[in-house]
UniProtKB/Swiss-Prot annotation:
It comes from Burkholderia mallei (strain ATCC 23344). The gene is ruvA. Has three domains with a flexible linker between the domains II and III and assumes an 'L' shape. Domain III is highly mobile and contacts RuvB. Residues 144-193 are annotated as: Domain III. The RuvA-RuvB-RuvC complex processes Holliday junction (HJ) DNA during genetic recombination and DNA repair, while the RuvA-RuvB complex plays an important role in the rescue of blocked DNA replication forks via replication fork reversal (RFR). RuvA specifically binds to HJ cruciform DNA, conferring on it an open structure. The RuvB hexamer acts as an ATP-dependent pump, pulling dsDNA into and through the RuvAB complex. HJ branch migration allows RuvC to scan DNA until it finds its consensus sequence, where it cleaves and resolves the cruciform DNA. Homotetramer. Forms an RuvA(8)-RuvB(12)-Holliday junction (HJ) complex. HJ DNA is sandwiched between 2 RuvA tetramers; dsDNA enters through RuvA and exits via RuvB. An RuvB hexamer assembles on each DNA strand where it exits the tetramer. Each RuvB hexamer is contacted by two RuvA subunits (via domain III) on 2 adjacent RuvB subunits; this complex drives branch migration. In the full resolvosome a probable DNA-RuvA(4)-RuvB(12)-RuvC(2) complex forms which resolves the HJ. One of its GO terms (cellular component) is Holliday junction helicase complex. This is Holliday junction branch migration complex subunit RuvA. The keyword Cytoplasm applies.
Length: 193
C-alpha cells in the first residue's frame, strides 16, 4: 500500500495531479478541497494517499490532511459508495461540513453534492453517524465543536423538546458559537416554529 507521497508537483488538471517522486510520475486523484490548497507546479508537495486496486486499474487518491483521508476511507465502507462518489462528497463539502451534516442529519446539505440523491444522502447519514470522530464535530470552527452541539442538544432535550426538534433548531446555530449563545439561538428558532 502507498500511504504517503512526497515529491515535485508536475501537473494540475482537476481532479488529477502528477507528482514526480525520484523520477517516477504518480497520477493522483484529489478532492477539490485538496486541489485548491496545492502548491504551484514545480514546487514540493506531500500527500497522504489511499491506493485502490481494481481488476483493471490501480488508482491513487491523495489528501493534504489526515481527516480528509480517514473520511474518504469511511465513505468507501458504505454500500454503493465508490471512490468517485467519495471524492465528489469531499469535493463538494469540507470534512467539518460533512460531519455537521451527519450530526444534524441534514440530508438536504448532502443532496447539493452532484451525484448524491435523497436516498443516497439518507444512507450516508445513517451509516456515517458516529463514525467521523469527535474532533470533526458539527459546529465547524468552534473550539470543541462536538461538545458544543452535544451540550446544546442535551439542554434542549432537558427542556422538553424532542431530539428531532432540537436537531432542527441547532441547524440555525452559526459556526463558532458558544454553548449558552447556541442554546439561546436554538430556543429562538423553536419559538418561531
Amino acid at each position: 500500500m502507498i500511504g504517503r507521497i512526497a515529491g515535485t508537483l508536475l501537473e494540475k488538471n482537476p481532479p488529477h495531479i502528477l507528482v514526480d517522486c525520484n523520477g517516477v510520475g504518480y497520477e493522483v486523484d484529489v478532492p477539490m478541497s485538496t486541489f485548491y490548497n496545492l502548491p504551484h507546479t514545480g514546487e514540493k508537495v506531500v500527500l497522504l494517499t489511499q491506493l485502490i486496486v481494481r481488476e483493471d486499474a490501480h488508482l491513487l487518491y491523495g489528501f493534504l490532511t489526515p481527516p480528509e483521508r480517514s473520511t474518504f476511507r469511511e465513505l468507501l465502507k458504505i454500500t454503493g459508495v465508490g471512490a468517485r462518489m467519495a471524492l465528489a462528497v469531499l469535493s463538494g463539502m469540507s470534512v467539518a461540513e460533512l460531519s455537521q451534516a451527519v450530526t444534524l442529519q441534514d440530508a438536504a446539505r448532502l443532496t447539493r453534492v452532484p451525484g448524491i440523491g435523497k436516498k443516497t444522502a439518507e444512507r450516508l447519514l445513517l451509516e456515517l453517524k458516529g463514525k467521523l470522530g469527535a474532533d470533526l464535530g458539527p459546529l465547524a470552527g468552534a473550539a470543541s465543536p462536538s461538545d458544543h452541539a452535544t451540550d446544546i442538544l442535551n439542554a434542549l432535550v432537558a427542556l422538553g423538546y424532542s431530539e428531532k426538534e432540537a436537531l432542527a433548531a441547532i441547524k440555525n446555530v452559526p459556526a463558532g458559537t458558544g454553548v449558552s449563545e447556541g442554546i439561546k439561538l436554538s430556543l429562538k428558532a423553536l419559538s418561531k416554529a
